[in-house]
Amino acid sequence: MAKLTKEEVKHVANLARLAITEEEAEKFAEQLGKITDFAEQLNELDTANVEPTTHVLPLVNVMREDVAVKGLDREVMMLNVREQEDGQVKVPAIM
């Protein structure tokens, strides 16, 4: 598998609207490279006699009635938020 570059990581972070530093981009490129290398090992497995599946469990069309309920009061909810910006909840970037 090709090594992920800092530029690719920064591009994906930008698409996800995450602000990351140069150091984080370098660290994430290395970490994501290790993850893709590990996942690449699956290509070495012989799956010729394995039936393709789309779901692990045989569950089909599990549905419930859609019932609308009143949500939280926005002002009360925002009182419990650790950090906010422009009226939105701000959470740490996780990559």
UniProtKB/Swiss-Prot annotation:
Record keywords, A-Z: ATP-binding, Ligase, Nucleotide-binding, Protein biosynthesis
Database matches in Gene3D superfamilies: Glu-tRNAGln amidotransferase C subunit, N-terminal domain (1.10.20.60)
EC number from the UniProt entry: 6.3.5.-
Reaction catalysis annotation: L-glutamyl-tRNA(Gln) + L-glutamine + ATP + H2O = L-glutaminyl-tRNA(Gln) + L-glutamate + ADP + phosphate + H(+); L-aspartyl-tRNA(Asn) + L-glutamine + ATP + H2O = L-asparaginyl-tRNA(Asn) + L-glutamate + ADP + phosphate + 2 H(+)
Stored PANTHER family: GLUTAMYL-TRNA(GLN) AMIDOTRANSFERASE SUBUNIT C, MITOCHONDRIAL
Function field: Allows the formation of correctly charged Asn-tRNA(Asn) or Gln-tRNA(Gln) through the transamidation of misacylated Asp-tRNA(Asn) or Glu-tRNA(Gln) in organisms which lack either or both of asparaginyl-tRNA or glutaminyl-tRNA synthetases. The reaction takes place in the presence of glutamine and ATP through an activated phospho-Asp-tRNA(Asn) or phospho-Glu-tRNA(Gln).
Subunit structure: Heterotrimer of A, B and C subunits.
NCBIfam families, sorted: gatC
Designated name of the protein: Aspartyl/glutamyl-tRNA(Asn/Gln) amidotransferase subunit C
Lineage: Bacteria, Bacillati, Bacillota, Bacilli, Bacillales
Gene name per UniProt: gatC
